[in-house]
Amino acid sequence: MTKLTNGHLVTQDSVGVTRHDYLYRISLKALIYNDAGQILVVKEINRTYWDLPGGGMDYDEDFESSLKRELYEEVGYKGDLRYQLFDASEQMYIERLDANQICFYCRVWSENIDFIPGEEGDEIMFINPEELLLQKSEVDAPARAHAAHMKWQELHSEIVR
């Protein structure tokens, strides 16, 4: 017998041994700066908070195709891009998905910064990184976006030294 419970499969074999296999949703977030050092954020439709553009990988996608799809869906971006994976979140349980999630953060360099709200984006803007901490939110997405910025700055300063 197998059932999905709290983000993992619970399986009981024929002799009564129970096994827990955790399911993970892989999510990608794009850290994109403009020339003024501001960060691109999106407020998705039916959400009340600002976050980095990105989302869950679909089956059979690699990082680049997933990033391109998410950037198109949320901020209307269709061009080429370069990216560097630089951090991963701790595992977190997402109740609405009944799944555990690990989020990978990617620094993205785009061909241009002509962004418009995509089909899943309600509003977009560039924001000073410190202002992310002032955003009122029922979730910690703005704080996680700021933490990603700080991590990138830390890594980038080590590379420059």
Regions found by a protein language model. Give the residues of each.
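Acidic, metal-coordinating catalytic segment for phosphate/diphosphate chemistry
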Residues: 1-29
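Conserved hydrophobic "DFG−1" position in protein kinase catalytic cores
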Residues: 32-33, 41, 106, 126
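Conserved Nudix-box catalytic region and its N-terminal flanking loop in Nudix hydrolases
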Residues: 34-74
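Short helix-loop capping/hinge motifs at secondary-structure junctions, enriched
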Residues: 38-39, 111-115
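Nudix hydrolase/Nudix homology domain
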Residues: 48-49, 119-161
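A short coil-to-beta-strand element that immediately follows conserved catalytic motifs
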Residues: 78-87
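Active-site-adjacent beta-strand/loop module that shapes the phosphate/pyrophosphate-binding cleft
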Residues: 90-113, 125
